[in-house]
Amino acid sequence: VFLRVYGGPHVQYVQRRWDERWGLFDQVMAQRGYVVYSLDNRGSDRRGVAFESPIHRNMGGPEVEDQMVGVRWLKEQPWVDPQRIGVFGWSY
């Protein structure tokens, strides 16, 4: 599994549409047997001030906690080798 992270602020990764920026990468990785996993943590866009504001002057806390919830969920899945979870992404 590749965990793609973007800690914020702004941007919404998870959408119900083809993503021109990452769609081809995700498709190639899937064809090679990998899963690319993304979640929108607190601080990401389009969910209102209450969802976006927790990282204001508090970066490195709430968004990391949210990503770790995702990692724990991934480790419980039968199709995931918990010893082979990588992370990539960018932000502040």
Q: What residue spans do the PLM features occupy?
A:
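Serine-hydrolase catalytic core recognition
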Residues: 1-92
